[in-house]
Amino acid sequence: MIQQQTLLKVADNSGAKEIMCIRVLGGSKRKFGNIGDVIVASVKSATPGGVVKKGDVVKAVVVRSVKGVRRADGSYIKFDENAAVIIKDDKQPRGTRIFGPVARELRDKEFTKILSLAPEVL
C-alpha cells in the first residue's frame, strides 16, 4: 500500500536510489496505490552521473509492494520491500535494466517492456 510520503527503492539503473511518493495517479480522491499503479515521486537519493538527479519529480510504476495483492485464483503475492521503476510519459522505463523480481500484474496494465527486462516475473 503506497501513499503520500512513502519511500520506495528504485529497481532500475536510471540513477535514482530512493524516491518518495508525492501522489498516486488515478483520481482526485485516490489515497493508496499498489502493484501496477503509477505514482508521481520525488528523487531523494541518486547516484552521481545518472539520468535523474536528486530533487527531480518523476513518474514511476510500483513493481513490488509489502502489502499483498490478491490474484484471481485466490492467492496473494507480496514482497519484502516497496520498489518502483521510473517511467517516461509513454509508459516506457527510463533505465535499461530492471533489478529484482516483478509481479505478473504489470502485464494487465500494459507495462510489457518492464516485464521483458525483468530477471524474474512472479
UniProtKB/Swiss-Prot annotation:
One GO biological process term is: translation
- Show which residues constitute the signal peptide: none
Protein origin, superkingdom: Bacteria
Picking any one GO molecular function of the record gives: large ribosomal subunit rRNA binding
Gene Ontology terms, cellular component aspect? cytosolic large ribosomal subunit
**Keyword list, A-Z:** Ribonucleoprotein, Ribosomal protein, RNA-binding, rRNA-binding
InterPro entries per the record? Answer: Ribosomal_uL14, Ribosomal_uL14_bac-type, Ribosomal_uL14_CS, Ribosomal_uL14_sf
Q: Does the keyword rRNA processing apply?
A: no
The subunit structure is:
Part of the 50S ribosomal subunit. Forms a cluster with proteins L3 and L19. In the 70S ribosome, L14 and L19 interact and together make contacts with the 16S rRNA in bridges B5 and B8.
Instruction: Name the protein family.
Output: Belongs to the universal ribosomal protein uL14 family.
Protein task:
Binds to 23S rRNA. Forms part of two intersubunit bridges in the 70S ribosome.
What is the protein name given in its UniProt record? Answer: Large ribosomal subunit protein uL14
| This protein's encoding gene | rplN
